[in-house]
Amino acid sequence: MILLVPSLIITLMYFMFAEVPQRPGAPSPFDNACLIILGVFPLIVMFLITSITMQRERVSGTRERILTTPLRRLDLLAAYGTAFSIAAAAQATLACVVSFWFLGLNTAGSPVWVFVIAIVNAVLGVGLGLLCSAFARTEFQAVQFMPLVIAPQLLLCGIIVPRALLPDWLQWISNALPASYALEALQQVGAYPELTSVAVRDIAIVVGFAVVAMGLAAATLRRRTP
């Protein structure tokens, strides 16, 4: 299910936009919408799956039993992060294959970079999910982090209103959120045939956010549940 849902949603979007008029010389509505989905959907899905799964591991006692061994907290988080990241990579790969080779998604830049950014966004979702799971006591609380952590990023990253048109104080908040840079990197790939310095900077920033989130998750991981 985790592999198929993004591709099914993108396919549904393809048929939704099939009859929508396209301006000459401009990207099609499907191209614009699909790029956004390829960027934000892996972030959302992997955040939910990671935070809920880690909370379930804690409640069942599996995580505590593992931590009774000499295994370090950072090693445990790295193992979980690697496992979730592999699932994220498989999800992003299938979604990109369906989008580019079956549904005809067109971008000025290479599809490879769209694929890379989609994976980076998914890994960011894993990192944020691992971090938030450390503060949740139940699976319901883990789900409640979704509107707190993810929703503001979707509202302020430029999907609804361009970031340049936001009030100054909202632009400052937007500049501190990783999804803003993830979407900007995808927009750069969609608009330019070569990878721009802005896209490289944005990808590096998103990777940095993911690494910091995983590091903080390791620091907050407790060996015993209160």
Language model segments and positions:
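Hydrophobic alpha-helical transmembrane segments of polytopic membrane proteins
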Residues: 113-136, 154-157, 208-216
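Small-residue-enriched core segments of transmembrane alpha-helices in multipass membrane transport
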Residues: 33-43, 115-125, 147-155
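Short helix-loop junctions at transmembrane helix boundaries
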Residues: 92-112, 120, 124, 134-140, ...
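Transmembrane helix segments
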Residues: 14-23, 136-176, 180
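Transmembrane helix-boundary elements of multi-pass transport/secretion proteins
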Residues: 1-64, 73-93, 103-114, 141-144, ...
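Alpha-helical transmembrane segments of multipass membrane proteins
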Residues: 11, 15, 96-101, 130-131, ...
